[in-house]
Amino acid sequence: MITNTALEYKGNLFPSKVVSYEHEGDSISFNTDNNVILKVTILRDSLIRFRFTTKGYFSNDFSYAIDKSQLHGYNFLNVSEEENHFEIRTSKVKCKIKKADLRLSIYDLNDFLILEDELGFHWEESYEYGGNIVKMSKSSKDGECFYGLGDKATQMNLKGKRVENFATDQYAYHKDQEPLYKVVPFYIGLHNKQSYGIFFDNTFRTFFDFCQERRNVTSFWSEGGEMNYYFVYGPQMQDVVTTYTDLTGKPELPPLWVLGYHQCKWSYYPESKVKEITSKFRELKIPCDAIYLDIDYMDGFRCFTWNKDYFPDPKKMVAELAEDGFKTIVIIDPGIKIDKNYWVYQEGLEKDYFCKRADGPYMKGKVWPGECNFPDYTNPVVREWWAGLFKELISDIGVKGVWNDMNEPAVMEVPNKTFPMDVRHFYDGNPCSHRKAHNIYGTQMARATYHGVKRFVYPKRPFVITRSAYSGAQRYTSSWTGDNVATWEHLWIANIQVQRMSISGMGFTGSDIGGFAEQPTGELYARWIQLGVFHPFCRTHSSGDHGNQEPWAFDEEVINITRKFVSLRYQLLPYLYTMFWQYIEEGIPMLKPLVYYDQDDTQTHYRNDEFIFGNHILVCPILEPNAVGRRMYIPRGEWYNYWTNEFAIGGREVWVDSKFDEIPVFVKAGSIIPKYPVQQYVGELEFDELVLDYYFKIGKEKSEVYEDAQDGYDYKKGRFSFLSFRTIGKEKELIIQLHKEGKYETPYGKYKINFIGLPFKVTEVEIDNEKIEFSAVDFELNHFLIVEKGFNELHIVGE
């Protein structure tokens, strides 16, 4: 017999019958007779928010994840009451809510069932902390697949997996390890060629189960807070990802140099070592734009200080590096050393800016400097103070970017590796414990850092990178996948992680090339470089405890492969820049898993390795040693082997030969790929032509090229160049139409168009309806034309 009252009532609780409802504007509220309220808000015809409370009223509606600058609106909304349910209809979907228990189901307008509750919303009282453990379970359809969730070191398709979201410092993590550094509680479901998304905007520790515990049930739950989630309808995965990215926000355009190659190590010091590294890059003609300084540049690991023994004149050093094309990036951690003679600590203490325990004393934890206090970045006053601390680094010394690390937050020598859960946070006027603030701590640090860097680097654009992040962090920062390991398994993990981050809204992501922990072989490093140059963020980083990891740390062959692939990245910078422009303008991910590219082809649903880089390039890394090629899946359509220009029909798995200095790369037929000449750093060269590689296709295709001044904010005033190419290929004819938008005039005056795969001999060329003189013999030999920029239509006729 149970006599303990708490135990007697412990267990799952459920909404009871609906007793009333109200419809006001874009929101409909349903009230049950046991005080549960479900508030349904229609943000768009395909974006619906579901918010539950069990106490008869809602707490303050606040989210760090949602981009409040986005305007929402729907085209159609109708609410009707039926005998057993309510129906909410938009121009895209209809939602039925049962009167008996608030369980809901969502259909398209053809009555196809997209998603339905199993148990639906339920909860359990949290007797240890107060509040509720909130839960949701959904029925899963046969063959349903699941994607997203950000930084997860597991298969692309999450079917059969259970994952945990709690930002954690996981040094040398392994495949399937949970949790990791980032928290992105957003997933994409796909069944019967229909995609939808769920974003569970809850910053407490959350869990997702994709049919692991029960075969046909998907569930998600949190240790506290509200059951507050957004449903996003596709039906294409592209629509789901774009809508979610709009909801949580997009970054501003980075300066072009940020898309170059970066070199980092824990740590490069003293100054002579830094210059030795940068000089070697220039000597070997391996392009590089950024050099990083890890924690050893500081005085006793105190943030915003310099070790003058290692770096006696940092301003002079940074200026000299800049003359050679290197931008200096420095690390800044959240732990502020407890030292009464340290000016940052003095200010934080004087102004009461550090996090406190529940009963009053400051949160104290050991990090690199020893005992530290930690700023409460959830307080806007503290964020403003933190932003101001960057003045000397950026304005005076000339540092170009900041790297935030250890901001999960990580604390050494404690069992849970982070703050105690009783630490209090301001949470922008919604005071709470660390249970609620933990997952957004790193994002708010990155936010404060971003505003500081942006303020002092102006009129140039800022660059910030963070290890820990929550949904929406992409508005302020790039990221990397944390302390990985120099193993072939981690090369496989890195490939999937960056793809997954890309479709989870955080596209500006890369991995530590070569692995942070342990030491790669030359072969592994070369294969990682070959993958890493196709990631949005491209940086080699390693632990100094495990040997050297510069390209020349191996042999001449690895040096040559590194030069070849980094040079290729620099050639593709206009293509990369265009990818980024489409990401910030339209929410289109820069990397596209094959399932995103073609969800109707079931062969793509379980592919991990292959991905689309931008819109037109297919990449498949080599992920095992001693490989002379690999099997890979070429998606449906027509493609050209980048290295051989051989034509390939997709929709099938094929063997592709691949030498050590190559990986399988294919270009979509009909595409135009823009290229710059190889530069050792962005801005090194002036050039008078843009190379355009055109890959012939019978039919139509679109390609785009975005350019601007490569830094600064004139692009926001219309001073950009956006070229839209439309190609029409026929058996003996090719038409290239060009439309330009924007007021920016590129410094080059010509296009060099390389024609690949032309099936006919060219006999006539017209530009804007005027025939031009050209040498058929030379064209036959070289297959290119040099034309003045600014044409509207290029017409090529053959026989």
Question: Residue spans of the language-model regions?
Answer:
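Catalytic core of carbohydrate-active enzymes
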Residues: 450-462, 469-480, 493-497, 501-511, ...
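Conserved, mostly hydrophobic/aromatic
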Residues: 40, 92, 186, 281, ...
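Active-site-proximal structural scaffolding
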Residues: 33, 179-180, 220-222, 237, ...
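N-terminal accessory segment at the very beginning of proteins
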Residues: 1-257, 264-266, 271-279, 290, ...
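Surface-exposed interaction regions enriched in Ser/Thr/Asp/Glu
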Residues: 788-799
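Aromatic- and carboxylate-enriched substrate-binding clefts and catalytic-loop regions
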Residues: 55, 63-65, 116, 287-562, ...
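Short, well-ordered loop/turn elements at secondary-structure boundaries
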Residues: 34-35, 81-84, 89-91, 100, ...
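Internal mixed beta-strand/loop scaffold within catalytic domains of large alpha/beta enzymes
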Residues: 107, 112-117, 164-176, 181-182, ...
